[in-house]
Curated annotation (Swiss-Prot):
NCBIfam families: acpS (TIGR00516), pantethn_trn (TIGR00556). Mg(2+) binds at residues 8, 58. Its cofactor is Mg(2+). This is Holo-[acyl-carrier-protein] synthase. GO terms for molecular function: holo-[acyl-carrier-protein] synthase activity; magnesium ion binding.
Amino acid sequence: MIFGIGLDLVELEQIRQTLERQPRIVKRVLTAEEQNRFYTLSDKRQLEYLAGRFAAKEAFVKAFGTGIGADVSWLDLEVLNEASGRPVMTGPFEGTIHLSITHSDHYAAAQVLLEKRSSDVSTNLDRN
């Protein structure tokens, strides 16, 4: 059963400007493991990587129904890649997190679908 769907779109230029003004954003948004990967990339790929993770985490909190900082922090969420390149998100959700990330020359976007097993979902149906 679908619990929530979230979508986020960010401009790479906005992320680039933020990164130049506030380099600490890397440590605020990316987990230690994500940072390890980030620092192995070229400047162009670093920008795409950071923007994609930023969008993915924003999409998660939209699907979860909260905002960053309220119940979920940036570092509660982690996006790593399988050997195939498929991004996999882990976070404070008891169910399956489906994630898709894409980017172009100017934008990065992510979509998150949160899925719970039907047995995990309580209902208030009247069974008369």
